[in-house]
Amino acid sequence: MDNKLKTVDAETLLSMPMSKTMFIVDGLISQGVNVISGASKIGKSWLMLWLGLQVAQGNSVWGLPTLQCDVLYLSLEDTQRRIKDRLYNLTDSAPDNLYFAVTSGLIGGGLEEQITDFLTEHPATKLVIIDTLQKVRDSKGSAGKAGMYGNDYDDISSIKRIADSFNIAILLVHHLRKLQDSDDPFNDVSGSTGIIGAADTNFILRRKRSGNAATLLVSGRDVEYQELTLQFNDLVWELVERKNSEDIHKAELPKFLFRVVDFMECRTEWVGTATELLTEMKEQEVTPNMVTKYLGQFAYEVLEPLGIEYRTKRTGKSRLIKFLRRDGDDANDTGIAI
């Protein structure tokens, strides 16, 4: 048995023809394993059924194009009667290329063979939805030597091998833990970090019990970070707003700096301390220390593109700030001194 590493040099790799990453939903759901996690009973199954219908019929998802294809939906917490009732609520013309199963084997206990057989018999299938992940895992097993992380990673990797082998997207529906991490929502996924680590894309659906609004967070290897604001209306999750990483970053920029730009609109130059700046701008909520921090972190990103040059210099016990507004050809003159 040849146990050597199979390597490829960078030059050869760059010249190798490769197809682009396949997306079932453009820019959102890509080939590979996708895990969507949310609290129980918040509408994940309604979302999955609607998504399956949209893809099977080739309809857009929140304004994004879809790759029309056959869809397999393992709705393992439902009965055929419940699925039928939901279909009646969502569509008048159910497609014949959306397939359902309410029972299946477990990972490592027949599931992989069942999915593989179906994909072989239905080669037009490009999306498989498994609702839920817990229903296809062996709950009687122990962590053993691999530990929880190892078991979680192995289970997702087993599903990923099918996705990669058949070049399809598999969407796993999962739960969030009850105790949540306010700093990183992706740490709220039930189980170990092996689940999000093995997945190609992770989705977090967060909804307040008392309302119909929710936020869908997206992070993946082939998709950029996104935050989608959704509204649950007439049993369908509708898009209210979509923000990508650039939009989110811009929203986090201090509004104070944009007020500095307005302040300099009728001035060509201003020199003074942070305290003097706040006094002239009539700022009540920003402190001198915050001014120093904002200018140090974001002046180049906010002020410079808008024609305001910023410099600072310590003189004795004070630190002077200097703004110079550049117009037209002056923008090419970088000379500014205090």
Segments (PLM) and residue ranges:
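Conserved inter-motif catalytic segment of the P-loop NTP-binding fold
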Residues: 2-5, 11, 19-20, 24-25, ...
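Pre-Walker A (Motif I) flank of P-loop NTPase domains
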Residues: 30-34, 69
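Phosphate-binding/switch region of NTP-binding enzymes
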Residues: 35-37, 41, 45-46, 72-74, ...
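Hydrophobic positions on the alpha1 helix immediately C-terminal to the Walker A/P-loop
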Residues: 47, 51
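Gly/Ala-rich phosphate-binding loop of Rossmann-like dinucleotide-binding domains
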Residues: 56
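Amphipathic alpha-helical transducer elements in NTP-driven molecular machines
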Residues: 80, 84, 108-112, 149-157, ...
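Short, conserved catalytic or adaptor-binding loops enriched in Gly and charged residues
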Residues: 89-97, 192-196, 302-303
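DNA transaction DNA-binding modules
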Residues: 230-338
